[in-house]
Amino acid sequence: MEKVFNFCAGPAMLPVDVLAQAQKELVNWNGLGTSVMEISHRSKEFIKVAEESEQDLRDLLAIPDNYKVLFCQGGARAQFAAVPLNLLGGNTKADYVDAGYWAQSAVEEAQKYCTPNVINTIIDVDGKKAVQPASEWALSDDAVYVHFCPNETIDGIEINDLPVTDKPIVADMSSTILSRKIDVSKYGVIYAGAQKNIGPAGLTIVIVRDDLLDLASQTLPSVLNYGVLADKESMFNTPPTYAWYLAGLVFKWLKSNGGIDAMETHNRKKAAVLYDYIDQSDFYRNDVHSDNRSLMNVPFQLANPELDTKFLELADEAGLKALKGHRVVGGMRASIYNAMPLEGVEALVQFMKEFEEKYV
C-alpha cells in the first residue's frame, strides 16, 4: 500500500504505533474477550485506563496538584459556553483576546452569558499578519478572566505571549496542547478538543484550578459544570470510553518518545523545513510574520490561485491528503501535529518543488 500522509486540521492523523496497538486490541482487550469500548466505564478495568491516562497527562504537562483534569464531551465549542457559565460567579465582564476565527467563535458564544471585552490583537508588520505584544493588549480592570486561543488553525497564527494580568487566564489549546512545553500554573483553565494532538474526536480535556470550581451559575447544566465533573471524576454520565482509551495510548506514546521536550524539538524542525521552502520560493507564499507563525498549521497560497485545484488533485494522488485550506481563507494548509513524521513534511516539500518546476 502506498504511504499516505494526512495533513487534515482535525480530526487529524494519529500515531501509527497507537493505531496498530488499537487494531491489535480491538476485539479482545486485555484478554477479556471483548473490546475496551464494550466494557462498563465503572468496571475496575476501565477505571485503571482512566487513572493511568490522567496520571500520564499530568506527568507530560507537569500539572500541579491543585488542578483537576476532566475528560469531557462536547468539543471545544461546548467550552465556549462552559467557560463563562463556570467562571463568571455572578459577574458580567470578561476579556477575550481576538487573533482569529476560533477566538471570535468563543466571543460569539460567550456574549450570550456575559459582556466580552474584545481585544483585537492582529497587526500588520512588513505586509505580514502579526500579533500585538501582550504588554499592549487593552485588558479591562473589571474582567473576571482573560480568554485567548494560543493557536489559530485557519490563519496559522500563534500567540507566543501570555496576557499580562492577575486574573485567571483561560486558554483554548485544542491545536497546541502537548506540542510544546507550557507552565500550567500560569493558567486558570486550559481546554482542548482531542482531535488534533490527543486522540479521536469526541473527547475534550479540561484542566482547571481548584479555586475556580465553585463559581458556576445555578442554571449551568450539570454536564458542563466543572465542579460536578471533578466530584464525579469525569463520570457524571457515561464518558466516550474508546476515545479516552485512545487518548491514553497517545499519552503513553508521547512518554515513550521523549515527552514534551522531544516533541517540541520535533515540531520545530518540521515547521522549519516547510516554512524555509515556502520563503525561498516565489511560487508559494505564507502571509504570517515569522514571529507568529504556527508550529501546527501552515497555510500557504500559490502565486497563481488558478492552479489550486490541480495542486490538490496531484497532491492527493501522491498520498498527501487533506491539504485544502479552510473555506474562510482558501489556498492550502498543512497541519503538522505531533503524529506527523518529519518524513511526511519532507515528502510534501519534495512534491511542492516538483509542482513548482512543472507549472512555474
Curated annotation (Swiss-Prot):
Homodimer. Binds 1 pyridoxal phosphate per subunit. GO terms for cellular component: cytoplasm. Catalyzes the reversible conversion of 3-phosphohydroxypyruvate to phosphoserine and of 3-hydroxy-2-oxo-4-phosphonooxybutanoate to phosphohydroxythreonine. This is Phosphoserine aminotransferase. Its EC number is 2.6.1.52. Belongs to the class-V pyridoxal-phosphate-dependent aminotransferase family. SerC subfamily. SUPFAM superfamilies: PLP-dependent transferases. GO terms for biological process: L-serine biosynthetic process; pyridoxine biosynthetic process. It is found in: Cytoplasm. The modification N6-(pyridoxal phosphate)lysine is found at K196. Gene3D superfamilies: Aspartate Aminotransferase, domain 1 (3.90.1150.10), Type I PLP-dependent aspartate aminotransferase-like (Major domain) (3.40.640.10). The keyword Mitochondrion does not apply. Pyridoxal 5'-phosphate binds at A76, R77, W102, T153, D172, Q195, N237, T238. L-glutamate binds at R42. Keywords: Amino-acid biosynthesis, Aminotransferase, Cytoplasm, Pyridoxal phosphate, Pyridoxine biosynthesis, Serine biosynthesis, Transferase. It comes from Aliivibrio fischeri (strain ATCC 700601 / ES114) (Vibrio fischeri). The keyword Cytoplasm applies.
